[in-house]
């Protein structure tokens, strides 16, 4: 009986140990599965996060490149406008300087009025500051034309240059520094654009 009890105790121990080992193996197996699931979920989350980060980085790069391109375009347009403005101002200054020479201006007026039909009534409008000196030169050079209906008048709206008006029609021909410079600039502008074209 003593052996039976001992065998029974050993059997209970053995069964308990086997059950404990089986339970322990089940727990370990379950823990491994859970760990594998956690790792798989973590890897999936990391993959999704990496893909999202790469997309955001790529989007940021694309936006940054587009912003850079726009900034470069704006800079080029700004430089072109500034160069165009400098060119236009230099052109106006040069035309004004040329038209400041009263002898040249008088010759120009004479050549232009010579091409008009005889007997046409013309009014030559000169800027006020140059009127007296130009009037003397023109009276000497035009002589009889002034008696035949050509008239010289001071005009406030002209800085340099002159305007010619046909009396009967009311038509004006503008030879002021501003108008000549504008016409030259419009003529030269396409060529100027080709010279400064960067892109």
UniProtKB/Swiss-Prot annotation:
Lineage top rank: taxon: Bacteria
GO molecular function terms noted in the UniProt entry: ATP binding; proton-transporting ATP synthase activity, rotational mechanism; proton-transporting ATPase activity, rotational mechanism
Keywords for the protein's UniProt record, in alphabetical order: ATP synthesis, Hydrogen ion transport, Ion transport, Transport
Cellular component GO terms, alphabetical: proton-transporting two-sector ATPase complex, catalytic domain
InterPro entries: ATPase_V1_Esu
GO terms for biological process, alphabetical: proton motive force-driven plasma membrane ATP synthesis
Protein family according to the UniProt entry: Belongs to the V-ATPase E subunit family.
Function: Produces ATP from ADP in the presence of a proton gradient across the membrane.
Protein name as catalogued: V-type ATP synthase subunit E
Protein species of origin: Borreliella burgdorferi (strain ATCC 35210 / DSM 4680 / CIP 102532 / B31)
Gene: atpE
């Amino acid at each position: 009986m003593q052996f039976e009890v001992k065998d029974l105790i050993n059997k209970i121990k053995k069964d308990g140990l086997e059950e404990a080992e089986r339970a322990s193996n089940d727990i370990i197996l379950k823990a491994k599965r859970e760990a594998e699931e956690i790792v798989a979920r973590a890897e999936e989350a990391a993959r999704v996060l990496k893909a999202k980060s790469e997309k955001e980085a790529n989007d940021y790069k694309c936006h940054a490149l587009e912003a850079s391109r726009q900034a470069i375009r704006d800079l080029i347009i700004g430089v072109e406008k500034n160069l165009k403005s400098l060119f236009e101002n230099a052109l106006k200054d040069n035309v004004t300087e040329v038209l400041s020479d009263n002898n040249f201006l008088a010759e120009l007026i004479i050549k232009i009025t010579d091409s008009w039909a005889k007997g046409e009534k013309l009014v030559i409008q000169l800027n006020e500051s140059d009127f007296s000196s130009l009037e003397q030169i023109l009276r000497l050079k035009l002589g009889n034309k002034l008696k035949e209906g050509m008239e010289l008048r001071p005009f406030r709206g002209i800085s340099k240059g002159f305007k010619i008006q046909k009396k009967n029609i009311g038509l004006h021909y503008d030879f002021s520094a501003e108008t000549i410079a504008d016409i030259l600039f419009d003529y030269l502008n396409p060529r100027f654009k080709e010279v400064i074209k960067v892109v």
